[in-house]
Design a protein with these regions (language model features):
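FAD-site-proximal beta/loop scaffold in flavoenzymes
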Residues: 2-29, 119-172
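Structural/interface elements that position substrates and couple domains in central-metabolism enzymes
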Residues: 5-20, 34, 79, 88, ...
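Conserved beta-strand-loop-beta-strand element in the redox core of flavoprotein oxidoreductases
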Residues: 17-22, 94-114
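Rossmann-like NAD(P)H-binding beta-loop-alpha module
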Residues: 17-51
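A conserved FAD-binding loop/helix module that cradles the flavin
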Residues: 37, 44, 165-199
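Rossmann-like dinucleotide-binding cores of NAD(P)H-dependent redox enzymes
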Residues: 45-92, 196-201
Length: 201
């Protein structure tokens, strides 16, 4: 069982030539299930296809109309051969005597069914860690718990001098995107510090 963000990260650094193919947690010929139906799930499913999976199936508890993924991502996944199990609510992951995942059991409109998979990738909805918000006054968040930040200086929260970036500000993405956000926030911090110095002179 793997996290979608981990799969995407390892695939990215494999494509960059930083690690070998054996570090990408999808083996050629495997039957892969991706849990969830957002943009990250679509990315993970398409990545698994490109890594040589025999089949990739997105398992989603709601209908096609309810999926949070944008249509462009969905259509791209279909074109690459990703399959979909709609209204399929997983109740149990199945394993063998060695502890290896061999499939899942789920409630479907036709009743309880079991599906065989070699690997399961988790791309379900997540919320950012809230400890920083609960222990620091004056930091505002949106309805989903993500920290609200300003464009100028980039990354500054509603509390003056406190900055945020990456997965605590938006949905989980790749490490590459987190690094990009960190660089942008660093520029915002530098601008803020320069402004404070200027005002104090």
């Amino acid at each position: 069982m793997i996290q979608a963000t981990y799969l995407l990260h390892m695939a990215n650094i494999y494509n960059e030539g930083t690690v070998g193919r054996d570090k990408v947690p999808v083996i050629e010929g495997e039957h892969v299930a991706v849990m969830g139906c957002g943009n990250v799930a679509m990315d993970a499913a398409r990545t698994a296809v490109r890594m040589g999976a025999a089949s990739v199936t997105i398992v989603y508890r709601r209908t096609e109309a309810d999926m949070p993924a944008i249509q462009a991502e969905y259509q791209a996944a279909l074109q690459e051969g990703v399959k979909f199990l709609w209204q399929t609510s997983t109740t149990e992951f199945l394993g063998n005597e060695d502890g290896k995942v061999v499939g899942l059991r789920a409630n479907t409109p036709e009743g309880v069914k079991e599906y065989a998979f070699d690997r399961i990738c988790l791309a379900v909805g997540s919320r950012p860690a809230s400890r920083i918000v609960s222990t620091t006054e004056g930091i505002e968040t949106d309805d989903n718990g993500y920290v609200l930040v300003k464009e100028r200086p980039f990354g500054m929260t509603s509390r003056k001098g406190v900055f945020a970036g990456g997965d605590v500000v938006h949905r989980p993405q790749t490490v590459v995107m987190a690094m990009k956000a960190a660089k942008s926030v660093a520029v915002g911090i530098a601008q803020y510090v320069d402004a404070v110095k200027l005002l104090s002179e």
